Amino acid sequence: MVRLKEKDGGVVFFVKAQPRSSRSAIIGEYDGKIKISLKAAPVDDAANVECCRFLAKSLGVASSRVRILSGHSSRIKRLTIDGMGAAEAATLFGEHLESVEFDL
């Protein structure tokens, strides 16, 4: 079950990133986190930038609203989407993750 928490006018969640993949995609749930594959390598912040841009594009929000709060040098990252509630985020992620439950 993926946990989404509302904090400071946005929604906070954890992502497990898999860099150097053949394509960028939202894969599913991994240990309470949203698992995504990223085409970019984890060099010079490229994977972090792609992580934010890819999630923004996939969820239909501006890339400036998606930020990494912690985990810049780790595969486990804590992200926020500004101006979005947990219920809205669960709905948007649910379009990509059919069998995943969300803890709001």
UniProtKB/Swiss-Prot annotation:
NCBIfam families: DUF167 family protein (TIGR00251)
Entry protein name: UPF0235 protein Paes_1868
Source species taxonomy: Bacteria, Pseudomonadati, Chlorobiota, Chlorobiia, Chlorobiales
Record family assignment: Belongs to the UPF0235 family.
InterPro entries: DUF167 (IPR003746), YggU-like_sf (IPR036591)
HAMAP family for the chain: UPF0235
Species this protein is from: Prosthecochloris aestuarii (strain DSM 271 / SK 413)
Entry GO terms, CC: cytoplasm
